[in-house]
């Protein structure tokens, strides 16, 4: 959309408002139907192919998915298209987003273990970095309940020791996912517990001043997308050894003015499937590399 603002001084301004694939899907609703398909990719394809959605094939990019979903779930008249697509992705803790080239994209939780950019050290310089060690992502118990199923629970092995180290026990509950059986629900609960049952010193956010970079580094930053993996090296207060973390991009923000272009990357820990035996970065035994 374009908005024009005319002033008596003769100075006029034009403002443009745009939305991405998620915003467009959020404005659409379904007719009633019974969904088929047993993977996230199959169900997303079925949903986007419907007449009331009619999403272009060229505007999608889907992983197959790692979970087996219910094959006959009901979608009600008026259900929001974006909400349903997000439910499908959440059912296996996958990622649904609009890519840098504008396509609706689904990535399952088994992400690539290739770092696409290195920040700090001898890599791309950054302007600022935010680190957290809080309890927001710290849980001793995870409960997953699928649609039509029973609650399945994964708990830390030693609750007493956990409480002594981390304080009061904390629970994470996920409900309404479309997994096909309770065994998969338990697998998901155990996956999340492994990810969140230990405190981590994590880089939460990193900012880069784009115009200060070489053209090669600028292109590297601009080509990054959600679910890409990056390496971050920094030395807190320039004291002690450098900290190196392997992180996944979960958000990208651009702040642009006539004199500045700042890119902010929101980051999260690389999930547990990044373990690779004998990998120099992800499978070094007898070190704490797996605890990054």
Predicted regions: what they are:
Residues 5-136, 242:
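Charged- and aromatic-enriched interaction segments used to assemble
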